[in-house]
Structures are given as C-alpha cells and as structure tokens.
Amino acid sequence: MAITRPTLDQVLDIRTQLHMQLTHEQAASYLELMQPSFDAYDLVDELADFVPPIRYDRSSGYRHRPSAKENPLNAWYYRTEVNGAREGLLAGKTVALKDNISLAGVPMMNGAAPLEGFVPGFDATVVTRLLDAGATILGKATCEHYCLSGGSHTSDPAPVHNPHRHGYASGGSSSGSAALVASGEVDIAVGGDQGGSIRIPSAFCGTYGMKPTHGLVPYTGVMAIEATIDHVGPITGNVRDNALMLQAMAGADGLDPRQAAPQVDDYCSYLEKGVSGLRIGVLQEGFALANQDPRVADKVRDAIARLEALGAHVEPVSIPEHNLAGLLWHPIGCEGLTMQMMHGNGAGFNWKGLYDVGLLDKQASWRDDADQLSASLKLCMFVGQYGLSRYNGRYYAKAQNLARFARQGYDKALQTYDLLVMPTTPITAQPHPPANCSITEYVARALEMIGNTAPQDITGHPAMSIPCGLLDGLPVGLMLVAKHYAEGTIYQAAAAFEASVDWRTL
C-alpha cells in the first residue's frame, strides 16, 4: 500500500512550519526530489512489523471490564487470566499489571480517555518474564491519567479508593496496583514510577513498593513518560515476594535504551542477613518538607529506632542535593513528557529499541480533544511547552547536567552509609477532592505528596517504601534508599524490620 504523497500546497505549508522562504517553483522541485524517499516509506509500510512473538496463549482467556459492583475500589481496569509456566520463582502467584503495561490482546487505557479502545499487539518484557517465572496474570490495574498524579482521583473514568478507607486516595499513579495487593485481590502487582508512583501508593495502602535503579528492569512495552525518569518495579504484600519479583523481572533485554549493563543480584540472599552493622543515614531534608505531618514523622522515627535496636548504626545526615533533585524534576519531567509522551505520541525519537507503532497511532488522537486531558497533565504540558518554545529546551538540558551533580550528592553520602531513610510521603492518604473541585485543589491533591519520592527518579537510585505503622487507621511508609544496584541492601533492612514486628500494630 502506497503512502499518501504531499501536494504542492502541503509542501508550501511545511515550508512555513520550518521557517523557510521558498518560491512555488522551488517547492515544486523539492516535491519531485522527495519522491524516492516516499518510495522507501512505501516499502516500510508494506513490510510486517518486527515485534516479539506472544509466547503464552491467551486465546482461551476471557477479557472483561468489571462492573462497579464487581470492582468496589475501581482498582481493576480489565480482568483476564493468562497462565504462565508451571514452575518458577513466582509459581502460584497472581499478578495485576499497571494499565500502562502492554499485555497483548487485552485493552490498555493508561487511565486516559484518548487511549480508550487501544489493544496492544505484543507483551511488555516484564510480562513475559513474570509468565516465565510461573505467575498468573489476572488483569490490568487502574492507573492515573497518563500516570501524572500521586493522588488517585485523576483516572478515567473514576477515582480509585483506598482499601483502608473508602473515599480516600490509594496513592498514584500505580493506584490500582497497590490497592489490589493491599485488599488481597492479587498476590503481587507491577507498578511504574516517574515521580514516586510505586512508592506513594505503597505508602498510602500499606504495601511494599520498590522503585529499582534506573534501567535495572526493562521498560520495553510500557508507555513512556520521559525516558530518563521511567521506572517499572514490584508492589507486594511482603518483602520476599518483592525480592522474588524483582529477581524475575531484572536484567537487560536488548530493547530498552534506558538500560546500560544493569547489574542483577541474588536479592533473596539478603533476606536473612539482619541489619547488624548496617550504617543508616537519617536524611534530615526528608523530614523538613513544608507539609510534613509531625505524626507521620514520629511514626517513621520510631521505625528507624527499631532498626537501630536490631543492630544498625543510625545517625543523621544532610544531603542538600535532595531538594535540588526534586526541583530538577520540573524542567526534566515537564519538558521531557511534553516532547516524548505528547508531541512524540508516547514514543519520541532518536533511540534504538522496540517501538509500539499501534500505541503511537492511538496516542496521536489526544489532539482531537485536548480539553479532556487532566489538569495535572495540562499543568505539566503548559510548563513544558513554555520551556521548549521560549527557551528552546536549554533548561531541560541544563537540568539533566545538574541531575548528575545531584546524584553525586547522594553517592557521596552513600559512601559513608549503606542506606538513607526518610518518610516516603509527608502525609497519609487524604480524601478524594470533590468532582467539582477547583483546578487548584485538583492539582494540589495530585502533587502534594511527591517531595521525597521525585528526587530518586532524577538520580536513579533504588528506593523502597515499606509500611511502618498506622495513623488514624491509615498506613505510614518508611522509605529506604541505597546505591545504584544495591537493591539487596534495601531488602536486607526491609526484611529485618518486617520480621521484627507486625506493622499494623504500630
């Protein structure tokens, strides 16, 4: 099938878009010269796409969008059943996938109406690896609108509720993933994290959520926001399942440009080591956020004291770059997502790997009704588009340079300490804003909890939220941060804390 050739008028319009001056005669010459290039386009159009085969049968599996009665938390987007290998690290485990992760043959909406009706044609790498490890996939978990919220009120078509209190946020953007694990509907779930989206819902719901080192787990087949902050990782009900899940998913796949020789470890080997002798730095900046609830801080300090009682060496540490990293998220995240996720239709350009052409085509439809985009996404796009058009991306570029400086601040502290600890979020889960709330309230409830979680997306360090108590019946999260590829050390401390006490009694 031949692609549609441009007309002379279209070439003249392109001339204007490219800020050029051409006569009609010159434009006609270029139009003629363009034809051999379009012959190559014809060939590309005719050839079958080169994507991974679907290795696990789903012809017999059902696909069902649950009713409100079947889905009281609104945590499911689609139900299905895909059985993996008979044996493996995750044999017998049921799993939910965040709905920005491609599962071939099952609809994917990414919490956003423009993607309604999209059905992936191949599996994400993490899907294949979970199935290889014996897991059974039960469906797609609701996520926030294009994953741009730490609250759980932005998903199309309805908010996700916290299993501990209906009408309260489950956290975002992996809102359904954490809610399904916390409610016991699945054993384990996959989440994504660009500003805290694994760790925030884990803190709000009382689950264990690991944002791995950037690039440790392949992002192939997961809808991108901005490649330098894209992460995918496990959300579970206990530490061992988390370690097993990371073991199954980690490692290079040769298709993800985010990966540069990722170092995979034997994560379960750390679970019985205890914390005796571990050096833990209590990050002072992590307790100094403007909206820090002192009661949350007290719960976290009590948890740190327990780690000290178990044998860890604990002392305060200051890393000024922590705050800088959080601020760098604005030019990197806003300009990056505006280019890659929006103008680049969920893919962007200039990288080698696996592109989802069908997703790119579907994502382009956001322009047909941009008014329906969420307020939190619009805000990021307004900032990003202004930075790109007024300053030509210079602040994105400079912020990426400064991100290396911010990483050095963490790395320097982690030469002295094995772990850094702080509250995952400064607050517990908050009530959903009313449906008719102002733009200001809508956005505030989407972003009020990211102060401690966004920095590690910028620096790439592994960070995990573990539940450490209840406050007025709502979970509190303790966050553990380690060196790049030192997820095992995080599991070491998390397992020791978990074994020492039932967090629900704290």
From Swiss-Prot:
GO terms for molecular function: amidase activity. Pfam families: Amidase. The active site is at K98 (charge relay system), S173 (charge relay system), S197 (acyl-ester intermediate). It catalyses: a monocarboxylic acid amide + H2O = a monocarboxylate + NH4(+). It comes from the Bacteria. The keyword Membrane does not apply. The keyword Ribosomal protein does not apply. PANTHER family: AMIDASE (PTHR11895:SF170), TRANSAMIDASE (PTHR11895). This is Amidase. It comes from Pseudomonas chlororaphis.
